[in-house]
């Protein structure tokens, strides 16, 4: 694999149409170093944490497992294996409701006495040597097998199985690997802290991913309000040929459809994917996980979660085992403040309201945001005034109010005519709507109905 000459940290001055500039609120947790959560007494590892088929358990009650042991698998074309995130004894199978409302089975594990804790755990995941200049690249097949065995999924929120994304397609050759370090969702800083504190596994993982898809170019996109992170990545990438580029700080800059044109000049087709224009996109945390899976044979068992908002006492960035409860992470951040009014799985733009603090963290959980009463706009919904603000804000040039109102009326063919499935649910339209119409919720409802029709 021969990469293009590096351009260092450069700036892309173009921007995309639409989008918004909500208050970032990242200052709440941005300067908080990653902390390792003490091993909980119990984790519940969901058997569906990804796009695709549900895994079947491969362990039973009373089995002893070690951290990293396989506990669920599926032979379906689209799925991702799941692994024990702590060492201990398997308890009786239970179920949990995920933030998106789906009820899924879990593998509960009661913690044993022997666990890695604190700095030792952090170093096991992100520390040590991560070769870049003298990286002995495995074959593409070996990289894909390692990624599949490790159960890797996109950690930016989509949770699409990574081994499928990296699978070569002779009909669609890949020119560029884009590594997404934008983290444009307000409040969340997990990726920022990872880029700042552990940039080398990100660079190593990017080199491995590019080798798997035979990309000649690697570009890391970072919003221009994260200069320290970009500098850390640039230093780690020295002499590798990897470019680190600033893009405008604007929501939703981290969306593939917005990021790919900014970094490559190629527009992703309306009903297509980045690979249609020779691009594969991976999140920075996913890149680090690829390095760990391929070079160390370690599966995805932990992730960094930002616990933030004015509704928590001490916002933090926490390295936590998959399957720990949201409530335990909130307690690790000092608990809820007295004026906490709403808890979100994720951030305020694309997150889901959390109804149960016992909900387990999954591979795609990037943050927990606790909002106060002052954060919430208590304005009643009124009729659409046809102001067009939602249209101006939509980064995909859709007409959100028409889609949402068609869904509300059950006019499904009309909703499809207005391209309901093209909507990425970024929330720009709802943020701008002066009538407080729940545009995103209506569109989600419409998609759910059409998916089950």
Model-predicted segments: where are they?
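Hydrophobic alpha-helical positions that pack around
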Residues: 215-326, 332-339, 347
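Short histidine-centered loop motifs in beta-beta connectors
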Residues: 55-64, 68
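Gly-rich Lys/Arg/Thr-decorated short loops/hinges at beta-loop-alpha junctions or inter-strand turns
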Residues: 177-191, 311
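Conserved hydrophobic positions within beta-strands
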Residues: 88-90
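Short hydrophobic beta/alpha edge segments that flank linear recognition/processing sites
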Residues: 65-79, 94, 104-111
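Ferredoxin-type iron-sulfur electron-transfer modules in oxidoreductases and energy-metabolism complexes
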Residues: 365-381, 389-391, 395-453
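Acidic low-complexity segments
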Residues: 97-160, 171, 227
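N-terminal, Lys/Arg-enriched amphipathic/low-complexity engagement segments
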Residues: 1-58
